[in-house]
């Protein structure tokens, strides 16, 4: 599907976003591990989260979607999964594959998990290595690196003390989910703090888990987790597209309600504020052990910054839209230490560089990031490629709002992977 984006003068709107993708995945998995009913409100029904739902049902979970954003999980406890009769397909979802590898490694049965063309080229050895040390057996392509992956699980999961080579919430979460089955204490130590949704949710459901700085300590379950009512806050990664839209269009004010403001996710807000963004968090509260608030965003004059090191894991998903903000910032913006972007749904460093050059932006590609010279006009009258990457597609749509002429974006349907309602909300903010 090809779409055309035409420029807009300003944005003045109030919006509410669908549920957070990371949290929706985890609520399905942890609810299935628990005993009793878990009712999930504001669930994100996207291609990625439905991959998780379908895989869980394939191994014996009982999950019913009773409306677009409401799901009921009839939890049977951690020891009641069954061997699947077919290959499990995570499609495009790396979160599904990596977190489910943690669960499957601790089951006393055989399973095979695969994905689409893109996911089968994403690195999995970083998850296989620690789970193998815990007792799971894995067989994968290219010397244990790529899916399809055969898993011979075991009920004799061993506790582990593990230092992750990179900060990765998915690697950490896979270990923590397997550790629920271990007898004793498992520690995960990261070089920098990554998203902590899994830790917060496990604690909310009754696990014995503690965090200190970049170390997480969890004890294996002596009784099942308990099903809970759960509200999924709005997705801050999804909000970031509209935040940047309001910042870079003139005379704009945008209110985004009930957004998750977990400190391990607000890196994008910190970076944008460093750039001079007028963003305020109001009406703060805590729901299900997750901080939530409303975001008030106003047009701002931005300046270039350098982003590197420990900040990168906290904004890794938002770098494509941050690049759009950088095109309108005064001076140079540098992104470095972000080589992980090359192993996402597409090589995002290359994709961002190629598409921004089409739009007339002065950008220099580097091995681990890029430099953007800002304060530039975005040139329209061209067709951009999404590379079937949802975050690239949505970032280009935001760029189109301030282009001097309309732009077209190919394969825009890929936004359904994470944000099926994007086009509807995008049109809403333009029309008010």
UniProtKB/Swiss-Prot annotation:
UniProt-listed InterPro entries: Enolpyruvate_Tfrase_dom, Enolpyruvate_Tfrase_sf, EPSP_synthase, EPSP_synthase_CS, RNA3'P_cycl/enolpyr_Trfase_a/b
Annotated signal peptide: none
Source superkingdom: Bacteria
Keyword Cytoplasm: yes
Residues engaged in binding phosphoenolpyruvate: 21, 94, 122, 170, 348, 391
Any Gene Ontology CC annotation: cytoplasm
Biological pathway: Metabolic intermediate biosynthesis; chorismate biosynthesis; chorismate from D-erythrose 4-phosphate and phosphoenolpyruvate: step 6/7
Binding site for 3-phosphoshikimate: 21-22, 26, 168, 170, 317, 344
EC numbers, comma separated: 2.5.1.19
Keywords: Amino-acid biosynthesis, Aromatic amino acid biosynthesis, Cytoplasm, Transferase
Main location: cytoplasm
Compartments, as annotated in UniProt: Cytoplasm
GO molecular function terms attached to this record: 3-phosphoshikimate 1-carboxyvinyltransferase activity
Cited NCBIfam families: aroA
Function: Catalyzes the transfer of the enolpyruvyl moiety of phosphoenolpyruvate (PEP) to the 5-hydroxyl of shikimate-3-phosphate (S3P) to produce enolpyruvyl shikimate-3-phosphate and inorganic phosphate.
Designated name of the protein: 3-phosphoshikimate 1-carboxyvinyltransferase
Species of the source: Petrotoga mobilis (strain DSM 10674 / SJ95)
